[in-house]
Amino acid sequence: RVWGRMPADRLEFIMPAVSSASPKLTFAFVMDPVENEPMDGSTTIVMMREAQDRGHTVLYVDPDDLEVDAGRVRSLAVSITLDLASETPITKGEARIYDFDEEIDVALQRKDPPVDRDFIVATQIMDVCRKTIVLNRPAAVIAYNEKLLATQFADLMPATRVTRRIDELKAFMA
């Protein structure tokens, strides 16, 4: 199923229900430019919308703006509001510097590969957070290749071969 079409009650494992008495949280999405996300079918947009619909604050953080200052993760971030029915589905607020451990409750790493130096440095910066809940865990993001991780569950997937050798791939596909 495409997550963008999944009923909200099926998303409880990602975004727990919040009652009116529950504290409102600040979610920071560390990701490639939010304007480039497809508005239909993007799991990142679905999670942003769910957080917003539940009354939480949603921030967009460009990984290039992350920094560590005196042992604290900080970043320029901008609040966003989503209205997917509008001609302008993303409205940005004022950009300002946020101290992650003091102002951000949950940070979601949604940066797409390639796993290059910039990706690794941004991930390592996120690992400095001590109070902020960081999803996906930075050490795991670096340690496990997202494509190769699935091979640890071979009994749950079709026959798969990972190789750089073209002759092996051709033989496998035959």
Show where each model-derived region lies.
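Active-site nucleotide/adenylate-binding loops and adjacent lid/helix of ATP-dependent enzymes
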Residues: 16-53, 58-105, 111-174
